[in-house]
């Protein structure tokens, strides 16, 4: 007989994301789009462009993972139910009378519930991406990590293409150059689930899914309540960067000291030259007098 813990984690891993968790994911993605400057005005002027941008926010991870695996990028359009659901949320979020959806979403408990449910879908996307990549490239670590990362956090990455098309792309906002917390934690999850998939991490998948989801939800809710950009592994990042890439900074003070010593020796030799020249002149004068 299985333990209650295993029964709980196994039942959790079998939870369907449709429709409630998918609705939360679409709602958070669309509301993040609406809060961007000029997004509401663009929806009134050009609804088709706004709808396309919303679909990129909702399905960007799946599109990017398809591109990496050389699959049709528009395969997400084949799921009519999810497209209609995401389109309905986009419509009521931008065109609801009296802006009722935005007013309801402004309450903190609603935001916490939606954000927590969205983090649950992130775990499912990472696991799905890693498993799907493993079916193409057996035990291909790099491919599995890349596809799991793309499916879990590809929405924020692929929207850079949308900003480039609209002409409002900014290099300093590039996700590859300055990774956000969701991108970092998704990369971490992709690495962990890749190790589990390749049997290098001795833990069952359903237990790992439960523990990682609890970590994601707890961290996200804490960040929203405290309104701080809390990064749980910032100390680990700093220590690892110093160990692997901080050697040049450690040796730079030694180089500066050697440079100062050489410059001091150079000035000393330059000052000794006039003294030597003066002594030579004195010797010449003395020899002339004796003559």
Swiss-Prot record:
Residue ranges of the TM segments: 16-33, 48-69, 81-100, 104-122, 139-156, 180-196, 208-225
Subcellular localization(s) per the UniProt record: Endoplasmic reticulum membrane
UniProt keyword terms in alphabetical order: Endoplasmic reticulum, Ion channel, Ion transport, Membrane, Phosphoprotein, Potassium, Potassium channel, Potassium transport, Transmembrane, Transmembrane helix, Transport
A Pfam cross-reference name: TRIC
Lumenal topological domain residue ranges: 1-15, 70-80, 123-138, 197-207
A GO CC term assigned to this protein in UniProt: endoplasmic reticulum membrane
Keyword Glycosyltransferase in record: no
Biased composition (Polar residues): 261-274
Entry membrane topology: Multi-pass membrane protein
Molecular function per GO: identical protein binding; potassium channel activity
Catalyzed reactions per annotation: K(+)(in) = K(+)(out)
GO BP of this protein: bone development; bone mineralization; cellular response to caffeine; endoplasmic reticulum organization; establishment of localization in cell; extracellular matrix constituent secretion; lung alveolus development; lung epithelial cell differentiation
Binding positions (a 1,2-diacyl-sn-glycero-3-phospho-(1D-myo-inositol-4,5-bisphosphate)): 118, 122
Chain intervals with Basic residues compositional bias: 282-291
Stretches of the chain found on the membrane's Cytoplasmic side: 34-47, 101-103, 157-179, 226-291
Residue numbers bearing the Phosphoserine modification: 262
Annotated region (Disordered), positions in chain: 257-291
Protein activity control: Channel activity is activated by increased cytosolic Ca(2+) levels and blocked by luminal high Ca(2+) levels.
Subunit structure and binding partners: Homotrimer; conformation seems to be controled by binding to diacylglycerol (DAG).
Its job: Intracellular monovalent cation channel required for maintenance of rapid intracellular calcium release. Acts as a potassium counter-ion channel that functions in synchronization with calcium release from intracellular stores. Activated by increased cytosolic Ca(2+) levels.
Family in the record: Belongs to the TMEM38 family.
UniProt-recorded name of the protein: Trimeric intracellular cation channel type B
Organism of origin: Bos taurus (Bovine)
